[in-house]
Regions:
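Helix-coil boundary/capping segments in enzymes
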Residues: 2-275
Length: 275
């Protein structure tokens, strides 16, 4: 789980139409998380990165392949690293057309700067997740490309991930035979807890696992895995110790309320086990 960064915003310009250059310089990006350009994340340390992660040649942490190789890939004997770009990548954008352009540019950038230069790295297909049809087209565009290992979604979205607005994404992923990674965090515009915004960074971090449980429950109960039986999901950076108890509780409630979800042919725990 590696988060590559751009040294500058202009680094994406070779893969963006000129209209988006001026748009970004004039208006920036606007996620569903309020009308703000910066990410809705605690600002204690840029990019949630260590201070010694700044590349010696300058730029943001995670923006230098050579420094990543020296500091992380080589000393830790990394055999395979999955790139999961976060931030202003097109996910959670209010302007869906801009989101699609950014996502496509990020995907080309991953190949040009990272995977083509180090075979230990594989990219994730970034998509404009709130526009399911356009996102599915981007996934199909990358079909058969060995640079990509998975599609990429985030756990906090406008709606829970099982909602039908996201189904075209799952259909495309199943079609090309790639799993979909669901990385913690996102730009859905909703509070990160079920009862509002918390006070502390600790609560933010604990909330990742809670949000992934919501996402997984939605995927199961909305019937995503029943509709797409060959789809596989990867829940990223939110732990997994909660999975057995979640599966048990879903089964317990399902035994009493299964008439509400007749589209499910098996127990929730079985879908979780198989997908």
């Amino acid at each position: 789980d590696i988060h590559p960064e751009r040294a500058t915003r202009e680094e994406l310009y070779p893969w963006l139409a000129r209209r988006w250059h001026s748009h970004l310089e004039t208006y920036g990006v606007h996620a569903y998380q309020g009308m703000m350009e910066g990410p809705p994340y605690p600002k204690a340390q840029p990019n949630a990165s260590r201070r010694d992660a700044y590349p010696p040649e300058g730029g943001r942490q995670g923006s230098s392949l050579s420094f990543m190789q020296k500091q992380h890939l080589d000393p830790n004997n990394v055999v395979l690293g999955i790139l999961n770009p976060l931030g202003a990548t097109g996910q959670g954008q209010r302007n869906h057309e801009l989101g699609a352009a950014l996502a496509s540019a990020i995907n080309d950038w991953q190949i040009e700067k990272w995977t083509s230069k180090d075979k230990r790295l594989k990219a994730s297909i970034v998509v404009a997740n709130e526009d399911g049809v356009t996102a599915a087209a981007e996934i199909r565009k990358r079909a058969g490309d060995p640079n990509f290992a998975q599609g990429l979604l985030l756990s906090r979205n406008v709606e829970p991930l099982g909602q039908r607005r996201y189904w075209p994404i799952y259909e495309a992923a199943q079609e090309i035979g790639l799993p979909v990674g669901v990385h913690a965090f996102g730009f859905g515009g909703n509070p990160i807890t079920a009862s509002g915004w918390p006070s502390y960074y600790i609560e933010e971090m604990v909330g990742h696992s809670q949000c992934q449980q919501t996402a997984l429950s939605s995927l199961v109960l909305e019937g995503v895995f029943e509709r797409f039986p060959k789809l596989n999901m990867v829940m990223v950076e939110a732990g997994f110790g909660w999975a057995p108890s979640l599966a048990w509780r879903l089964d317990k409630v399902f035994d009493r309320l299964r008439s509400e979800v007749p589209h499910l042919k098996r127990k929730p725990s079985e879908y979780i086990r198989d997908h």
